[in-house]
Amino acid sequence: MKSLKGRLLFLRKFVFFSLLILLFAHGASSSSSSFNYFDKRTNGKANNELALFSPTADSPSSVDGVLELPSAENVFAESSLYNAFIVATVDGSLHSYDRITGQELWSLFTNANPGLSYTKDENSLLSSKFLSQSNFKSYNSTHGEFYSDSTLNISYLSDDDTVWFVEPIDGGILYAFNLQTGLVRLPHSIKDLVHASPIRLLNNNVFVGSKNTTLFTIDVSNGDIVSQYPSGHRYETHHSVHNLGTKRDSVPSGADSDLSFKDPSGKKLSESLDLLDDFNYQVTVSNKSFVDIARTEYFITIYSDSNVILDLVYIDWTPTKNEIMYESFHSSSFDSKLALSSYDSSLHIVDTHSKFIKQNIPLMSPAATVFDIVTLPHNKKIDKSQTPAKFPTSVLLRQPIDTYLETMFPQIARNKTEHVYINHIGNAWFAMSERHYPLVSLAPEASFLYYNGFYIPLNSIFGLHSLMATPKPFFALPGLPGYDIPSYVESEGSTKTLPSIGKKPIPLLDPNPISSTPISITFWVIMFLSVSFTIVTFFSILRIRSSEVRPLKSQKNTVSINNKIDTSKRRRKGKRRKRVSDEHSASSNFNEIESQASFEQNQTLDILSENIVEIQDKSTDPLQKSLDSSLKSHLPEATVIQNTDGSVTVNSLTVYPEVIGYGSHGTIVYRGVYEDREVAVKRVLMEFYDLASREITLLQQSDNHPNIVRYYCKQKSDQFLYIVIELCKCNLSDLIEKPIAYDDLFKSIDLVSLLYQIAFGVSHLHSLDLVHRDLKPQNILLVVNNSPNLSKTRVRALISDFGLSKKLDFNQSSLRNTTFEAAGSYGWRSPEILSGSLSQQSKEIQVKTREGRIRQASHATDIFALGCIFYYTLTGGMHPFGSHYDCEGNILKGNYCLVHLQSLGECGVLAADLIEDMIAFEPSKRPTIEVVLNHPLFWDYAKKLDFLIDVSDRFEVEERDPPSPLLQMLENNSKSVIGENWTTCLHSSLVDNLGKYRKYDGSKILDILRVLRNKRHHYQDLPESVRRVLGDLPDGFTSYFVEKFPMLLLHCYHLVKDVLYEESQFKRYLEY
């Protein structure tokens, strides 16, 4: 063994020194090689292009046939960074913000529109295969808080409609959305189409394009336009602040310097971010600095048979061509501040050194481009007395977001599926891809898949989409055949971009190709030798490890494992706590799989993610050994058999190597079979047997319920505890955020019924005095009942993850100190958990707020999380307290917004009423789970109809002249319930039928209740035309009235609950 290890050590040293030689050889070959960017035929062209740059001291020069380019050190070493950003937003405006305080300084072009703008001649004919963005099919509908007297005009899409979007970068990248194809990115930008026009495309339609460019010179200190080429309309500057701040280290108001910046997976940014500045740049606060910026308008008009069918307008903001060279050097932030645009119209200023968000600047629309303002050394020598219009003193450089993409957002860089966010502001229809705007990956997915039928609401397509890339535009869009812009078409405005500029001189000619140099031959010889010895070393390591593992196979009741735990102990002996991970290779058994739990812990299709507390290693302490021994004695060890297919059999349980999920700190979930039933198997390290047993105990107490994940059994080997639980299809987060992946499942689900199941499961836990404390979409699992005899509900919701659950003591209404503080997950924790400090002066643990008030932490914490889950489910992934970064801050402030429920009609009104109570800041004001289950949101149409008829019967006996106090309460705020006159909201045939029998007062709630009651009792006597309007009993009939008056049911419900709750006829509606 010693000789083998000696050989291994020698081989490792040899490989190490070989690699050093390899790197040296590669560097030598790189430095001695040359790059032939221009050949003799393009010599004149290259020189002409280089002549575009101003002849300054630092401009490139040609010496002895070699283009001498300045290095980054020479260009920026003595440069000064102006203390402001210039931000171009998708609504077309320009804004300037202070780099230190984030305060807006000025704004320009506030009426411009750089996104994709649509205009259409109202008199022109529009082919059915095209869609004007301003001419969608429209229907009148009443939604949310828009009552009968104020209907909301909503636009809809059909399968034949195609909607166009543009990403405001790289010449206006075009996207097309269609219900049949999803979102498709086209390979040609608007700029390409303009340069290729005129051209016939798309069923022989004629595309004619043009562009118009205006150059502005702007005083960046106040936003004044000092010159304009060509001169024309003068634009007004809106001044917010007249002078820039001068205190460099000041902290902006409201900025959170402790907020850690995280990537879309939820993990902190990599600590290996090495893209730091090499120089200290001075931030200038001078009063005057001038920059050039170009505004280019691209116009495309589409003709069909001489008729204009669509006009597209795209406006782009760019620096001048003189600044192209400087942009190529701009590879990192000068002052370590990177401005990232978000989908929610905010600009996050991130410190690239500390990886913290320093500022969050709210904008009126998302930022399209962010420019740094840099004054170069040679510009400092300009005579200030000269005309500023002729001598801009600074240059605009786009912020180098691409440089930081892979380091700060590794998942986006590695993700094979790109995501794109689409939305519109006014007449600007824009797209933002996560590769250009990384923070849009946090946006909710578009909810158009929630809708069935030929028409869907237009606003349901706005959100995050998985990009369906296609090499040919319009290839799969209905009625739009593929096309190619001919390669021989070259516009006179097309330009050749300079090659990537490095720090070394670039010769114009390359006399010696790299492949012929002697150093290149040496390089490949050394590479061959290094690879050969690396292969030998690899197989030597395998031989040594196999010889160490072989004796374990003879031990009884063990599985042959090559685990890192023992080796880690020898290397780090004496450490009491550390993380444990297992290794897995393609050829080894599943026990060697490395545990890499993600932030959300639910990245697979079939998952069961359960949190287990932090892992502790076995200690050499005698007391710890005694404890381990006593824990293992709780359950006799089972016979473990290693099967040839890689699976493991433990008694009647077979565990397969297929990983379906990861838990916290080394817990792995595998697919398995238990007594001919497919199951999920959690493998837990034996060091945590006691903690896992507590979770098993809670599962055993609570799993006798259709909406609690089912526990089957536990098995134990000498190293692991196997917990066997129900196998599920996915979790609620997967279903809502990835509806395309679960299309069949999604279409079969009634979301309101699903929410009732979740609440029903929570009610079971609360009836057992259990507080879950970690309710979130990732812990709501979904299982499909394939047999129709099992249940009327095809999809069942199951509550899982009891790792943080706590059983309350008898008559205890709150939680223990040791388990309360860290409970819950980000974004789903109640305000009392986030802001409270625990008082230990009472047996019932109390929460003291920052204002000194005392609150109890109890079942209300689950109700709060459940309210957030309700909103998340109904709105397609939205959160009532805002975006990821602002969520918990808004929870602490009690700031919420339920506006996205308005599009759900009467269901949205009921949901908003319930959710608003569930997420109340004070726990005592939140409803119990029994009240939640009895809310009208979960009533079927028959129950709603019965309730309204009972209310009508009850109030008919009240004195009307003068009205009784109870009747006055019913009529209170009637305009917000039924409008000025409810008769104007009903169908004319129904109103005519009403007038034949008696008179009704259109301003009274009691009268509309009487109409509903009378027409229900005399439904069979109604004319056929009126019955068709009202629909069938009870669903169609009830739906007609509650959709016309969405506040009517809720108004009556609150009156009965507050005043008439003791009357017997209403108890069945209020008691669970």
Swiss-Prot record:
Residues 540-1072 are cytoplasmic. GO terms for biological process: IRE1-mediated unfolded protein response; mRNA processing; positive regulation of gene expression; positive regulation of reticulophagy. Its main location: endoplasmic reticulum. Keywords: ATP-binding, Endoplasmic reticulum, Hydrolase, Kinase, Magnesium, Membrane, Metal-binding, Nucleotide-binding, Serine/threonine-protein kinase, Signal, Transferase, Transmembrane, Transmembrane helix. The chain crosses the membrane at residues 519-539. The lineage of its organism: Eukaryota, Fungi, Dikarya, Ascomycota, Taphrinomycotina. Residues 31-518 are lumenal. Disruption phenotype: Impairs ER stress-induced ER-phagy. Its EC number is 2.7.11.1, 3.1.26.-. Residues 941-1072 form the KEN domain. It is found in: Endoplasmic reticulum membrane. It catalyses: L-seryl-[protein] + ATP = O-phospho-L-seryl-[protein] + ADP + H(+); L-threonyl-[protein] + ATP = O-phospho-L-threonyl-[protein] + ADP + H(+). One of its GO terms (cellular component) is IRE1-TRAF2-ASK1 complex. SMART domains: PQQ, PUG, S_TKc. PANTHER family: IRE1-RELATED, NON-SPECIFIC SERINE_THREONINE PROTEIN KINASE. Residues 654-938 form the Protein kinase domain. Residues 243-262, 553-593 are annotated as: Disordered. InterPro entries: IRE1/2-like, KEN_dom, KEN_sf, Kinase-like_dom_sf, PQQ_b-propeller_rpt, Prot_kinase_dom, Quinoprotein_ADH-like_sf, Ser/Thr_kinase_AS. The active site is at residue 774. ATP binds at residues 660-668, 682. Residues 569-579 have a biased composition (Basic residues). This is Sensor for unfolded proteins in the ER ire1. One of its GO terms (molecular function) is protein serine kinase activity. Mg(2+) binds at residues 779, 801.
